[in-house]
């Protein structure tokens, strides 16, 4: 369950988005949604058949996050100044899938995809 210090946000800050996109990836405009309080961006690479999603949302009072711990290994990592949780699992082809979640300044963030770990971190650090 998330805790919010002070008043919870009513909307994401103006211009809040992911600002780093790895070479060869394009946003899937059909799958994206953007609202005042949250967004979901989906990216894929036709060359490598890799994909990832970026989701940010203001924290709602009483909001919870659920984690699959049967097929995923979790560790704590730093995302800028924030503590994040990195989940590592494998897809049906044996390729690593990463799920990085953290909260910062009243906003929950998740970057998930079957792309290299260092790209997951660059994407995460480019959200502002």
Model region roles, listed by residue range:
Residues 1-104:
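Short, solvent-exposed recognition patches
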Residues 105-128:
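Surface-exposed amphipathic alpha-helical segments
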């Amino acid at each position: 369950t998330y805790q919010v210090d002070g008043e919870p946000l009513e909307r994401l800050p103006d211009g809040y988005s992911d600002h780093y996109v790895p070479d060869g990836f394009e946003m899937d405009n059909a799958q994206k949604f953007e609202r005042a309080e949250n967004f979901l961006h989906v990216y894929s690479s036709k060359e490598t058949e890799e994909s990832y999603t970026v989701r940010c949302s203001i924290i709602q009072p009483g909001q919870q996050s659920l984690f699959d711990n049967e097929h995923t290994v979790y560790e704590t990592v730093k995302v800028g100044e924030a503590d994040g949780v990195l989940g590592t699992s494998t897809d049906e082809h044996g390729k690593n899938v990463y799920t990085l979640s953290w909260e910062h300044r009243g906003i929950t963030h998740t970057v998930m995809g079957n792309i290299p770990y260092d790209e997951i971190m660059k994407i995460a650090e480019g959200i502002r």
